[in-house]
């Protein structure tokens, strides 16, 4: 039985609860929605808006992020300019070409380390890196090291060193892994028995903010070499390593910016790496915008698959790389296949799988995710056209969940397929 005193206390308590302020909370930023929820569209649309508004820094970030979504028109074409009509192309009359994968395998037979570079806005470079990684495994290459794998941080973070086949793969292992093409390379490497090594510089290896650009480069390159040695060569001096790095890091000889990763690695360890340039050799989205050296190669050889090109026994490349790498890979201009990039369809392990798409509103991504991993980085995804009812996924064998990401967020999965 309630007494007056009990009723009074209850009223006080209820009143107190009623006026208690809610805990402070703030909406997630577009970047947080990407990093925490795995949503790509908010960050993509925000970067597009910033670039359209003329924010200088947004363009570079947009190009890299657009590559994650398969938007090559933005990632590659955003900064393209036509060559001058009177631009002179390099003389290729004495140039020679070979199939790129065959040449790399042959050259790597007696090498301990292979270093391949990429441009961070070209997903196709990651597709080619996947095929190189696959081809090197039968030669005994056992370690996959990439610039994007995160080193230990001040705060607790996942480590790629512990990643094993079938584990959920998420962008906490490294920023560029958010590109599904990159993520599939890592998954396949685990399936093939590779171990993984991170070597990027740590927060405690960075010079003061007042350091010059060249000092920043020198500190980073030296730290990368030290870290690769500590992570791999110290404990496994005979390990055979495939390294995927950003553009300039693959230079084996001094050039603009000084001594880069490959050159410092060779000097410190005495190991002569096989260095491969592809970062500046990708076709533009329009032939008239091809760089002169790319236009010359495509005109001379008309390749249908990646090739390595040399002149007088020297790898042919632009002025930053010619004479500073062992091999230079050029990629063909390929037609799209089932609405998807030709380079993606050219991977012999991927199969074009046409799926029906539920109705949606506004911008949307069609995504296929590995069934056993849960809701992490897709195995494949691409931006849909308004009203698109069917689309082709490019998938390796396995079981997948299909879903859409729209402006509202991640929609419930709508289907399962087995390839």
Model regions: which residues?
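N-terminal export signals
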Residues: 6-24
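Compositional signal for N-terminal targeting/processing segments
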Residues: 23-419
């Amino acid at each position: 039985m309630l007494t007056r005193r009990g009723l009074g206390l209850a009223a006080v308590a209820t009143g107190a609860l009623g006026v208690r302020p809610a805990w402070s909370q703030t909406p997630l930023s577009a970047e947080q929605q990407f990093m925490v929820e795995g949503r790509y569209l908010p960050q993509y649309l925000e970067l597009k808006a910033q670039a359209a508004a003329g924010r200088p820094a947004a363009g570079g970030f947009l190009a890299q992020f657009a590559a994650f979504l398969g938007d090559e028109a933005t990632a590659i074409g955003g900064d393209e300019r036509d060559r001058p009509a009177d631009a002179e192309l390099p003389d290729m009359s004495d140039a020679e070409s070979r199939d790129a994968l065959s040449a790399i395998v042959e050259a790597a037979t007696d090498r301990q380390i292979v270093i391949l570079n990429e441009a961070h806005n070209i997903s196709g470079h990651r597709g080619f890196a996947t095929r190189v990684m696959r081809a090197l495994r039968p030669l005994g290459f056992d370690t996959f090291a990439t610039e994007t794998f995160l080193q230990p941080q001040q705060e607790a973070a996942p480590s790629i060193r512990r990643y094993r086949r079938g584990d959920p793969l998420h962008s906490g292992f490294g920023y560029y892994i958010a590109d599904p093409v990159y993520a599939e390379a890592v998954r396949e490497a685990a399936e093939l028995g590779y171990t993984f090594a991170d070597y990027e510089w740590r927060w405690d290896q960075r010079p003061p903010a007042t350091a010059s650009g060249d000092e920043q480069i020198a500190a980073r390159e030296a730290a990368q070499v030290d870290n690769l040695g500590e992570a791999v060569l110290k404990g496994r001096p005979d390990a055979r390593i495939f390294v995927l790095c950003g553009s300039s890091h693959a230079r084996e000889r001094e050039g603009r910016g000084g001594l880069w990763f490959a050159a410092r690695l060779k000097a410190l360890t005495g190991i002569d790496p096989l260095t491969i340039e592809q970062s500046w050799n990708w076709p533009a989205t329009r032939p008239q915008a091809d760089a002169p050296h790319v236009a010359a190669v495509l005109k001379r050889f008309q390749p249908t698959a990646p090739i390595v090109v040399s002149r007088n026994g020297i790898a042919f490349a632009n002025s930053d790389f010619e004479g500073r790498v062992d091999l230079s890979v050029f990629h063909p201009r390929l037609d799209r296949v089932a609405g998807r990039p030709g380079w993606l369809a050219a991977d012999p392990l991927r199969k074009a799988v046409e799926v029906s798409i539920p109705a949606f509103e506004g911008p949307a991504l069609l995504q296929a995710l590995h069934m056993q991993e849960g809701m992490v980085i897709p195995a494949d995804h691409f931006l849909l056209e308004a009203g698109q009812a069917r689309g082709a996924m490019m998938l390796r064998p396995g079981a997948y969940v299909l879903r859409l990401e729209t402006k509202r967020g991640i929609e419930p999965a709508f289907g399962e397929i087995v390839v």
